[in-house]
Swiss-Prot record:
Function of the molecule: Specifically methylates the adenine in position 37 of tRNA(1)(Val) (anticodon cmo5UAC).
Source organism per UniProt: Escherichia coli O7:K1 (strain IAI39 / ExPEC)
EC number(s) per entry: 2.1.1.223
Catalysed reactions, as listed in the record: adenosine(37) in tRNA1(Val) + S-adenosyl-L-methionine = N(6)-methyladenosine(37) in tRNA1(Val) + S-adenosyl-L-homocysteine + H(+)
UniProt xrefs under Gene3D superfamilies: Vaccinia Virus protein VP39
Alphabetic keyword roster: Cytoplasm, Methyltransferase, S-adenosyl-L-methionine, Transferase, tRNA processing
Name of the protein in its database record: tRNA1(Val) (adenine(37)-N6)-methyltransferase
GO biological process: methylation; tRNA processing
Domain of life: Bacteria
Length: 245
């Protein structure tokens, strides 16, 4: 499908090589997901897992960034979101490489015999309390259906020894998530703190954990420069995806 066809569509987000419809998904395409999909380390991976796939954004971004031999499994609990993810993937250049599963990850993982070099998730992080407009959005935003200990346990059960488990979270929640992960035997290997501009404190954090101990590399990413245009670093990270960058 051509870029001109993508541009005419209004029910989702247009990227350079694919289109993500998200009108039937509780959580829409946003900066968090784009950051995570562009940032996660893909060198040498053979098999990837997207937990809580939503519209299929992360699976599609990983497919664009990896070799044609890399297979990707995308697991999504909510049936309507999973159906839309499948439609998005069917219309992409990588339909043969991405498998969508409508399933509870905690049940699905027990049936798997393969392990994954890269596991990626843009997980829910709100606790119950703030009212949501729909049950689907509540499921996407709250940790009630998949809390963080369960998410870390699922990832641990199917990751390779040298693999990476990558998430994006609000800064403070990410700090707590890191403490929890370390207490469960994970090792933090990559951390990028994300700020809107140089004057602001980081509001998001990108984290990569591994079962294997090693040096932790950390840095800071600023999204916008003094002129309010995208910074050089953010442009370098995401320009393979944004249509007009």
């Amino acid at each position: 499908m051509s870029q001109s066809t993508f541009v005419l569509r209004r029910n989702g987000f247009t990227f350079k090589q694919f289109f993500v419809a998200h009108d039937r998904c509780a959580m829409k395409v946003g900066t968090d997901g784009i950051l995570l999909g562009a940032w996660a380390p893909v060198a040498g991976v053979k098999r990837c897992l997207d937990i809580g796939a939503g519209s299929g954004l992360l699976a599609l971004m990983l497919a664009q960034r990896t070799d044609d031999s890399v297979m990707i499994d995308a697991v999504e609990l909510e049936s309507e979101a999973a159906a839309q993810a499948q439609e998005n993937i069917n219309q992409s250049p990588w339909a043969e490489r991405i498998n969508v599963h409508t399933a509870d990850i905690q049940q699905w993982i027990t049936q798997q015999t393969v392990r994954f070099d890269l596991i990626i998730s843009n997980p829910p992080y709100y606790q119950q309390g703030v009212e949501c407009s729909t049950p689907q959005r509540e499921q996407a935003r709250y940790t009630t259906t998949l809390d963080h200990p369960s998410l870390l346990t699922c990832a641990a059960e199917c990751i390779t020894e040298e693999g990476f488990f990558c998430v994006v979270l609000p800064e403070q929640i990410g700090n707590g998530f890191t403490e929890l992960a370390l207490s469960m035997g994970w090792h933090l290997r990559l951390r990028t703190d994300v700020a809107e501009n140089e004057a602001r404190l980081p509001h998001r954090v990108l984290l990569a954990f591994s079962p294997q101990a090693g040096e932790c590399f950390s840095d800071r990413l600023v999204i916008r420069g003094p002129d309010q245009n995208y910074s050089e670093a953010y442009t370098a990270l995401t320009q393979a995806f944004y249509l007009f960058m």
